[in-house]
UniProtKB/Swiss-Prot annotation:
It holds the Pfam family IF3_C. This is Translation initiation factor IF-3. It is found in: Cytoplasm. Keywords: Cytoplasm, Initiation factor, Protein biosynthesis. The gene is infC. One of its GO terms (biological process) is ribosome disassembly.
Length: 180
């Protein structure tokens, strides 16, 4: 038996037409899926030829194997099209980070809040990092108040996934968009 090379192509998952061998009898389904009963493989191939379509082995492990009369090219096209549609609908959620400081001014705060709003509207998670430097570590309560203010300002569109906590010299909070 000669082994076929499939240069990058995937072999057909179903045997079709003359490739269905080693079987004497099959259970056949018609074009619309209606059962046509048991018949020999030769009769099934003749029916498929008369209809101008392919004989496709659907369930090779059944006893007797199940075959169907269908346009195999159209079947593969529709299958590939539906897989593309499913892939298109998948959304990869990213975690976007915005960095604040305890002394962030009101204007800068509003700009960063707008960016957080945009990230959450796009369906991404947002990581809010508040960095403390030097003596600011003595006033961590100011930083926690700022994180709580952010949480309150975004309460309508975001849910807190991980509450503010200290990690070394920075406080971190993760926000996730609310389900619609």
């Amino acid at each position: 038996m000669k082994i076929k090379k499939t240069a990058g192509r995937q072999a057909a998952p179903n045997r079709i037409n003359e490739l269905i061998t080693g079987i004497s009898e099959v259970r056949l389904n018609g074009l619309d899926g209606e059962p046509l009963g048991l018949m020999t493989i030769r009769e099934a191939q003749e029916l498929a030829d008369e209809a101008g379509v392919d004989l496709v082995e659907i369930s090779p492990n059944a006893e007797p194997p199940v075959c169907r009369i269908m346009d195999y090219g159209k079947f593969l096209f529709d299958k590939a099209k539906s897989q593309k549609e499913q892939k298109k609908k998948q959304k990869i959620v990213q975690v976007k980070e915005i960095k604040f400081r305890p002394g962030t001014d009101e204007n800068d705060y509003q700009v960063k809040l707008r960016n957080l709003n945009r990230f959450l509207d796009d369906g991404d998670k947002a990581k809010v990092t508040l960095r403390f430097r030097g003596r600011e570590m003595a006033h961590q309560s100011l930083g926690m108040n700022l994180l709580n203010r952010i949480k309150d300002d975004l309460a309508e569109i975001a849910v807190v996934e991980s509450f503010p906590k200290m990690e070394g010299r920075q406080a971190v909070m993760v926000l996730a968009p609310k389900k619609k």
